[in-house]
């Protein structure tokens, strides 16, 4: 409904403002915020249609090619409930992407809890694949 779409847009805008007030954002556009966070290039995106908050963490990885690393990424994904691990051989980077429902107002405490879990999972994936 129209009322639900307005509510979802409002939730996304409030979440965006909260993140902007708590983090040093380097760039932004109508759907995403980008910044450096704990050694990762991070993109936070908002979808008002669903409503979703997506966090993508990326980091350069040496020797990204190879069937072994792709198999390891697939194994990580079998055990990763909230997100997915990937290796982009073309640009030589590892990424972890997690999506969370944005169905209630996002508090700073909840955002940083989500972010901490995302970074922990990204670290786990990166160290398994880079090692």
Regions found by a protein language model. Name each.
Residues 18, 22, 72-79, 114-128:
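Conserved short hydrophobic interaction patches
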Residues 56-97:
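Short, internal acidic amphipathic alpha-helical interface segments
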Residues 7-15, 64-69, 110, 114-117, ...:
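Short amphipathic alpha-helical segments
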Residues 1-43, 84-88:
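Charge-rich, low-complexity N-terminal segments
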Residues 40-44, 102-105:
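Short, charged/polar, Gly/Pro-enriched secondary-structure boundary elements
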Residues 88-120, 124-131:
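Well-ordered alpha/beta subsegment
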Residues 42-61:
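A short acidic-to-branched-hydrophobic micro-motif
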Residues 31-33, 51-53, 92-94:
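Hydrophobic residues embedded in beta-strands of well-ordered beta-sheets
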């Amino acid at each position: 409904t129209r009322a639900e779409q307005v509510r979802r847009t409002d939730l996304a805008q409030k979440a965006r403002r909260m993140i902007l007030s708590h983090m040093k954002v380097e760039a932004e556009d109508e759907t995403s915020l980008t910044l450096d966070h704990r050694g990762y290039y991070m993109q936070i995106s908002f979808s008002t249609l669903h409503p979703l908050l997506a966090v993508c963490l990326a980091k350069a990885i040496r020797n990204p090619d190879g069937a072994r690393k792709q198999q390891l990424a697939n194994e990580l994904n079998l055990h990763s409930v909230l997100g997915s691990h990937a290796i982009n051989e073309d640009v030589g980077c590892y990424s972890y992407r997690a999506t969370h429902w944005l169905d209630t107002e996002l508090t700073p405490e909840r955002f940083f809890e989500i972010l901490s879990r995302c970074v922990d999972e990204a670290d786990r994936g990166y160290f398994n694949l880079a090692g």
